[in-house]
Amino acid sequence: MKNYRAIGLAFTFTALSSLSAFAASLPGGASTLQETYQDWTVSCQSQKDTTACVMRQEQSSAQAGQRVLTAELRNVAGGKVDGVLLMPFGLDLAKGASLKIDDTAGPNLTFSTCLPQGCLAPVSFDAKQVAALKSGTNINVTTTALSPSQPVAFKISLKGFGAALDRIQALTK
């Protein structure tokens, strides 16, 4: 279990280091911060006068205890949210994935690469979609298993999404 936690933290801090930095500092002069907002975790890293934050949700298999999905998002200019979904191996990468915010169609995703932890699908939500995320219940992700070829569905809870996003925006002003 510690190995998966370490992989998750490595993934987070790799993502944090690649984000554009913001001129802000964390409360109390801390160099890192981690807070939980219902089903979302806010993770921030501060170096000198820059702070980068992401919000993350990890889902694990109840049977095996292994991570099956990680959603990692950050706010960008214009009220948009960008990020990545880390999904398990065994999916038909050529078919990508589709998202719905509750029952409303969202962006279609294309897998960009695979890492030892799983396969990455970049995601971007415009301001209108972000408003729907803040008031929604779930992001419904549908993709296809490679063999046998059948639909695979994931639900990403939006409990705490708005509070986590507001916190990231406040910390990176």
Curated annotation (Swiss-Prot):
Protein name as annotated: Invasion protein B homolog BMEI1584
Keyword terms: Signal
Signal peptide (UniProt feature, chain positions): 1-23
Family: Belongs to the IalB family.
Pfam families xrefs: IalB
